[in-house]
């Protein structure tokens, strides 16, 4: 499948979002596993991937971390835009396979880190994060880390479809997109998604 806002990228995604999401979420919760966030191209990731493809200088020739990578959509877009080195990071172990398969489908290489990266600094030039401010405790952990990365010179970009815990007072708006989404997942057919830079 090709996400509607980023048709340049081919992904292995769930095509029946509603049934898969609800059935899998219930079944996996019984055995203590997380929902399959990696099986969908979320609006924040689509907006961020679109921005990177439209503004390749953001990543061209740079070492990039795609944080909370999920399917690898943003990572793949960054590689297509000319990133020198790309690492996708996600704590869901299923993401490693999803990212590998999706990278292969797009003829790019994406490394993978499965450990929690919050607080870590491997000297990335750019950190990309799509749709990560959906819960307050998680956003509260991310903001100091993103600010520390920014203060030492990294470019930190976040794609966000209007989640409640985005710290807009610390951000610079770069672009806004109307991203087609699945109503079963987002309760809408289009999500206004903004790409922000930590200032």
Describe each model-derived feature in a short phrase:
Residues 1-199:
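S-adenosylmethionine-dependent methyltransferases
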């Amino acid at each position: 499948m090709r996400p509607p806002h980023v048709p340049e990228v081919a992904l292995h995604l769930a095509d029946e979002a509603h049934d898969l999401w609800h059935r899998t979420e219930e079944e996996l919760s019984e055995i203590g596993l997380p929902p399959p966030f990696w099986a969908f191209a979320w609006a924040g990731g689509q907006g961020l991937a679109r921005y990177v493809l439209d503004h390749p200088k953001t990543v061209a020739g740079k070492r990039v971390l795609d944080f909370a990578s999920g399917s690898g959509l943003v990572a793949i877009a960054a590689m297509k835009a000319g990133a020198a080195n790309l690492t996708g990071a996600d704590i869901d172990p299923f993401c490693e396979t999803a990212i590998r398969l999706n990278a292969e489908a797009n003829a790019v290489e994406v490394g993978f880190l499965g450990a929690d990266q919050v607080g870590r600094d491997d000297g990335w030039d750019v950190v990309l994060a799509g749709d990560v401010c959906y819960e307050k405790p998680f956003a509260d952990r991310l903001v100091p880390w993103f600010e520390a990365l920014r203060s030492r010179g990294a470019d930190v970009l976040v794609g966000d479809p209007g989640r409640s815990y985005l710290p807009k007072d610390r951000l610079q708006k770069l672009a806004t997109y109307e991203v087609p989404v699945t109503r079963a997942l987002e309760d809408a057919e289009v999500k206004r998604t903004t790409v922000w830079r930590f200032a």
